[in-house]
């Protein structure tokens, strides 16, 4: 395990692992739909990848999310192709609300290292703590984060990540090779 850990850190070549939440962090929260992407997020995430850092989207979204609320039932009416049927007796089915979210990274030229999970070698220990390993976490629920107030699809005010603040913070942390404030 120590050798695997060292190989992993060597593969980063000085880069950091950055975990990024999805709804109201990278895009407007229109769960279970994928809301519009924040353009400032695209700029910052591309800059991080360009500087050798690894991005891991982490989110409650899943490929087999239980159909458990009116929003998901409506989502399935609009997108029946997203449903996965489960064996008889195991609930009313599941829905994929992760794939479109991850594709938004790919469609915008943002390379992701992994999705919603720890390093592959950690899984061999049999211990799934569900706590993702990362050097930094970007989430609209972070303590100490500067936010901006936005209006969601229902016309309600909600907070979202301020990517200009995040960009400046990463500059101060020295995560960009050639960028200064």
Language model segments and positions:
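Alpha-helical substrate-recognition element adjacent to the catalytic core
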Residues: 1-118
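C-terminal cap/substrate-recognition subdomain and adjoining C-terminal extension
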Residues: 69-181
